[in-house]
Swiss-Prot record:
BP term (GO), one: selenocysteine biosynthetic process
UniProt-annotated site: Important for catalytic activity, residues: 24
PANTHER family, per the entry: INACTIVE SELENIDE, WATER DIKINASE-LIKE PROTEIN-RELATED, SELENIDE, WATER DIKINASE
Family (UniProt): Belongs to the selenophosphate synthase 1 family. Class I subfamily.
InterPro entries: PurM-like_C_dom (IPR010918), PurM-like_C_sf (IPR036676), PurM-like_N (IPR016188), PurM-like_N_sf (IPR036921), SelD_I (IPR023061), SPS/SelD (IPR004536)
Domain of life: Bacteria
GO CC list: cytoplasm
Positions that bind ATP: 24, 51-53, 71, 94, 141-143
Protein's recorded name: Selenide, water dikinase
The keyword Cell cycle belongs to this UniProt entry's keyword annotation: no
Length: 352
């Protein structure tokens, strides 16, 4: 059968209503919906949706728990291979964010009739490349026809029940590490609008296609204490950090000068190149975040920017910060110490 083609669609991002993890439901909407659901969590279920963590964890035996996550989204870039790679890396990130090891994955595909099938083949090949890099097989999947292409994975992992790293254990006296620069949401919006420089597109692509495996393995190594761990994705640094502080009943201070940013992103934000999801993120957290007086709104947007396969955010006891930093550096992870955890009403203070 001949492939169906179109001369009208030249770019994958033309078919997406928003890019990557910015396509998530607004945090406020999700909270409203989940708030009406009763948790059926039993004694074997170690992590559910009550703390908005990155994956579900279910104990199978005294020394083994299964970790399950699912993640998919519309195109963030026009190259189908790179789109597949980004989506797969993003799905795998949730496993690493739980201190777990991935075992296998299933593909999730939504694909329009009018695109050539070779596009889908390239998307799947991109996903396979990241599964290969993670050392896991893809054992199957599910596909449906959809006017908007989407791709992602359901990933299954494993961890010792006593070594699960959740987003709920941060303690006053901890310091906060971030393993990737912020700004991929704004960068992909610039790509979608055709206003991104080649340098920005290359840098953002490098961030989004880099697995969080190395950082995840360091945090799970047991070489130093990790009180809480999550990945920074669709709700931005502020949103995911606020989830961490809410669970810990503590308050975070962020040092603006230490937070790594993708070059060109602040200028783009100042020009209004900001995804709707990022603006929703800022609106959701604004009442619980204190910014320095006069801080431009464009910088606030960057801190709330919806990330696609963003870095890991870890809460580590201050006395072990140097040990953690050295271990991350040895693994080739360019981590930044961006703030600290203090006693206080759940929220975030941005300083600097």
């Amino acid at each position: 059968m001949a492939e169906k083609k179109t001369d009208k669609v030249k770019r994958l991002t033309e078919l997406s209503h928003c890019a990557g993890c910015a396509a998530k439901l607004r945090a406020s909407d999700l909270a409203q919906v989940l708030g009406g659901l009763k948790s059926t969590k039993g004694p074997q279920a170690l992590v559910g949706f009550s703390t908005n963590d990155d994956a579900a964890v279910y104990r199978l035996a005294p020394g083994m728990a299964v970790v399950e996550t699912v993640d998919f989204f519309p195109p963030v870039v026009d190259d189908p291979f790179q789109f597949g790679a980004i989506a797969a890396a993003n799905a795998l990130s949730d496993i690493y964010a739980m201190g777990a090891r991935p075992l296998f994955a299933l593909n999730l595909v939504c694909f329009p009739d009018e695109l050539p099938l070779k596009v889908l083949s390239k998307i799947l090949a991109g996903g396979q490349s990241k599964a290969d890099e993670a050392g896991i097989p893809i054992l199957g999947g599910h596909s449906i026809r959809d006017p908007e292409p989407k791709f992602g994975m359901a990933v299954t992992g494993v961890v010792h029940p006593k070594k699960v790293l959740t987003n709920a254990g941060a303690k006053p006296g901890d310091v906060l590490f971030l393993t990737k620069p912020l700004g991929s949401g704004i960068a992909t919006t610039a790509i979608k609008r055709g206003v991104a420089s080649k340098q920005l597109a290359k840098r953002a692509l490098g961030v989004m296609t880099t697995l969080n495996r190395a950082a995840g393995e360091v945090f799970a190594s047991g070489k130093f204490k990790v009180n809480a761990l999550t990945d920074v994705t669709g709700y931005g640094l502020l949103g995911h950090l606020l989830e961490m502080m809410t669970a810990a009943k503590a308050r975070a201070t962020l040092d603006l000068e230490r937070i790594p940013l993708i070059a060109e992103v602040p200028a783009l934000a100042e020009d209004g190149v900001v995804p709707g999801g990022t603006k929703s993120n800022l609106a959701h957290v604004h009442k619980k975040v204190r910014f320095p007086e006069g801080l431009p709104e464009c910088i606030q947007w960057v801190l709330a920017d919806a990330q696609t396969n963003g870095g890991l955010l870890a809460s580590v006891p201050a006395r072990q910060a140097l040990k953690a930093l050295k271990a991350l550096e040895a693994a080739g992870v360019d981590a930044a110490l961006i703030g600290e955890v203090q006693a206080g009403k759940p929220g975030i203070d941005v300083v600097g």
